[in-house]
């Protein structure tokens, strides 16, 4: 099993969620986050003064999938979240040792 974390632009969330649903992903956790990478933020003008905005709003999606679903999940995120512009985000893939559904006690792939 793998955990996929995708940091994407907030306006892409609904499209990515729909794309993941189309490939059989039934659950995820979404968190509003702020950060920056190579784009380093931007400047904004407010009441005549310029301000540096270091951390940009992003959305972090966390999805646990079977090993067989990993490539399909990554492909769905890439195709949907990519704009071709700086700040599209990143995808991280981690190993998951064990999953337990609290309500039923089911474990691992049965609990996903």
Swiss-Prot record:
Top-level lineage group: Bacteria
Keyword set includes Lyase: no
PTM note: Uridylylated/deuridylylated by GlnD.
Keyword Phosphoprotein: yes
Residues with PTM O-UMP-tyrosine: 51
Sorted UniProt keywords: Nucleotide-binding, Phosphoprotein, Transcription, Transcription regulation
PROSITE patterns assigned: PII_GLNB_CTER (PS00638), PII_GLNB_DOM (PS51343), PII_GLNB_UMP (PS00496)
SMART domains linked to this entry: P-II (SM00938)
Annotated GO MF terms: ATP binding; enzyme regulator activity
A UniProt-annotated Pfam family: P-II
A GO cellular-component term linked to this record: cytosol
InterPro entries: N-reg_PII, N-reg_PII-like_a/b, N-reg_PII/ATP_PRibTrfase_C, N-reg_PII_CS, N-reg_PII_urydylation_site
GO process terms (BP): regulation of nitrogen utilization
NCBIfam families: PRK10858.1
PANTHER family: NITROGEN REGULATORY PROTEIN P-II (PTHR30115), NITROGEN REGULATORY PROTEIN P-II HOMOLOG (PTHR30115:SF11)
Function: P-II indirectly controls the transcription of the glutamine synthetase gene (GlnA). P-II prevents NR-II-catalyzed conversion of NR-I to NR-I-phosphate, the transcriptional activator of GlnA. When P-II is uridylylated to P-II-UMP, these events are reversed. When the ratio of Gln to 2-ketoglutarate decreases, P-II is uridylylated to P-II-UMP, which causes the deadenylation of glutamine synthetase by GlnE, so activating the enzyme.
Subunit structure, as described in the record: Homotrimer.
Family under the similarity heading: Belongs to the P(II) protein family.
Protein name: Nitrogen regulatory protein P-II
Organism listed in the record: Pasteurella multocida (strain Pm70)
Organism phylogeny: Bacteria, Pseudomonadati, Pseudomonadota, Gammaproteobacteria, Pasteurellales
Name of the coding gene: glnB
């Amino acid at each position: 099993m793998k955990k996929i974390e995708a940091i994407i632009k907030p306006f892409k969330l609904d499209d990515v969620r729909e794309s993941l649903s189309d490939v059989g992903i039934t659950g995820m956790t979404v968190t509003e986050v702020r950060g920056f990478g190579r784009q380093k933020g931007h400047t904004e003008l407010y009441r005549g003064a310029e301000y540096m905005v270091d951390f940009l709003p992003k959305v972090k999606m966390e999805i646990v999938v079977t090993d067989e679903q990993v490539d399909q999940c990554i492909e769905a995120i890439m195709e949907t979240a990519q704009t071709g512009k700086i700040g599209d985000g990143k995808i991280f893939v981690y190993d998951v040792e064990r999953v337990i559904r609290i309500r039923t006690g089911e474990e691992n792939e049965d609990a996903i």
